[in-house]
Amino acid sequence: MRLVPASTLVARCKKPARPSRTVSTAMAALVLATLAVGCQAAGTGAGSSPAGTIIVAAIPGIDDAPLYVAAKNGLFRSAGLDVTIRSFQSVSQELQALNSGKVDIAEGDYADFFYAEAASPRPGLRIVADGYHAAPGVMEVLTGPHSDITTPQDLAHKTIGTPEPQVIPIQGSTPYSLETVATQSVLANDGVTSVRWKALPSQDLISALAHHQVSAILVQEPYILEAESQLGAIEVLDSCSGATASLPLSGYFATESYARRQPDALADFRSALQQAQANAVLPGPEQAVLAHNPGMSMQSASLVTIGAYPTTLDAASLQRVANLMFNSGVLVKNLLDVASMTGS
């Protein structure tokens, strides 16, 4: 769930019959932390890092905000770790850097990393920590304010714009991703089994809806906020509801070989990260980053819907994602055993 330029986020349009989207000041500050904390650009490197030194690949966004807070507030240093965060543009770039040893840990979408693991001829990835879970309003199918689509059933045979997949290849006419897999599950429960997908760059989805190139768009926050603000877009379906409620969205991964060599460093990293995740809903040092915000207003940040930051690593919870992928046909050979990736 990646941040759009802060300057594009303006006062949010309020929608009827929806719970309040306002979050605490600390939570808003947590969103802004990814913008205020400097990241090193992705670069070259060789081999694995020395003991106690960890290089983390991340695509700055809402989901990995606690990573930046932990770094800024010295939680990693207190754990005896020297953590460097390198920013990347895509999960595919992260995976390449992870597998080549240029980074030690990579944060990203569960569906992409699970697909990469399932496609590998031998086990290669380990889950270091759980990162981010869905909550109501973080992933939605939206239509324009004057659309005749008002219910999930109205989406049958319509074209839905969705972000281009980063790792999973398009199969048939479906651009599989965690977004489309979750949405298909909710649609099926509503009796809708046939929709058309149109994969587009994330930054083009709102324009496509505005110019009627698609009937609806499937987006996560903060694009939901942007679509509502710019177009008055209306929610038709919450993709993380019912069977997909509280769905795990992203996590932190290392290679199996690195996890075997550096178990203590990974345990210390997970502990420090979970401390930042646990403090995410409490007033605290996160508020200090607001003074250094390069563009997002406090009002806009407080209107972004934020999911949950888990403080434990539960293989059974993460297995829900693998099950969705298998049932939808993304994992065509075998059901991925997530517990084997956690050491549990």
Task: Give the residues covered by each predicted segment.
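Conserved C-terminal helix/tail region of periplasmic/extracytoplasmic solute-binding proteins
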Residues: 325-344
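Pocket-lining segment of extracytoplasmic ligand-binding domains
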Residues: 111, 147, 198-288
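Bacterial signal peptide processing site
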Residues: 40-43
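Short, solvent-exposed loop/beta-turn-alpha elements that line the ligand-binding surface or hinge
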Residues: 133-134, 241-244, 307-315
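Short, glycine-/small- and polar/acidic-enriched structural segments
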Residues: 47-199, 215-221, 235-238, 246
